[in-house]
């Protein structure tokens, strides 16, 4: 079987079974140990029987509902490879847009100042590690309630050479204890309403951690809790950045405006035209 034939089969088989037809490309890159460019340059190359067997097994497992990223053990985020397992949410492209928005606002708001930045809800460490690597002026902290998630993130920080301070705790509680004031708080909290959770794809619902996805009946529980805790840990001049669920922009904006009446609060749409981020800037 040639590379293009393997991809054609996988695309058709995945589509017939209601899965993303492009997943075959990710899997074949992993099996052949090449990047996408290498794959495209070798479309007419033969793959070995062993590679074909491995490839078809991965594809069948994905059709059964197992996320590709958990099978191959990583996801690419902001151009870097992050180890993932079922203790952490698989990083999404939308969160890369959150990173871009945060970095732009830090530069505009603070310039080259040394800052204390917290990512709340560590997961794989995608947000905290990326911020630490992209801007060396940031002292980055990250907090997660699940020690299992922290262990995954620590592994990623070590592999990628990022300096991040890890706290095991609930939301902003570690900073209440230490008295540390923060210049920037970033979070991609659980925001899926309980009812929507029931209708999610089995690929997500049966494998990714529910604690990282569901935010109460209306999906806004964690944002409400943030509003209670943020005023006690933020500097007067600060930035808050949230990823949100589709349709939650105005609700989260209202919550931030109530907590910080003088802040400039902005709902930002992602590349697909969906409200996906809310930023608050305090002078």
Swiss-Prot record:
Q: Which reaction does it catalyse?
A: L-glutaminyl-[peptide chain release factor] + S-adenosyl-L-methionine = N(5)-methyl-L-glutaminyl-[peptide chain release factor] + S-adenosyl-L-homocysteine + H(+)
Concerning Gene3D superfamilies, the annotation shows: DNA helicase RuvA subunit, C-terminal domain, Vaccinia Virus protein VP39
Give the enzyme's EC designation. Answer: 2.1.1.297
Any transmembrane segments, and where? none
| Top-level EC class as recorded in UniProt | transferase
Q: Which residues of this UniProt protein bind substrate?
A: 188-191
A molecular function annotated in GO for this UniProt entry is:
protein-(glutamine-N5) methyltransferase activity
Q: One GO biological process from the UniProt record?
A: methylation
Q: Does the keyword Methyltransferase apply?
A: yes
**At the top level of its lineage, which domain of life is listed?**
Bacteria
Where does this protein hold S-adenosyl-L-methionine?
121-125, 144, 188
A Pfam family that the UniProt record links to this protein: MTS
Among its keywords, does the record have Methyltransferase?
Answer: yes
Keywords from UniProt, A to Z, are: Methyltransferase, S-adenosyl-L-methionine, Transferase
Q: Which CDD domains match?
A: AdoMet_MTases
The entry's function note states: Methylates the class 1 translation termination release factors RF1/PrfA and RF2/PrfB on the glutamine residue of the universally conserved GGQ motif.
Concerning its family, UniProt says: Belongs to the protein N5-glutamine methyltransferase family. PrmC subfamily.
* Protein name as annotated: Release factor glutamine methyltransferase
Q: Which organism is it from?
A: Bacillus cereus (strain ATCC 14579 / DSM 31 / CCUG 7414 / JCM 2152 / NBRC 15305 / NCIMB 9373 / NCTC 2599 / NRRL B-3711)
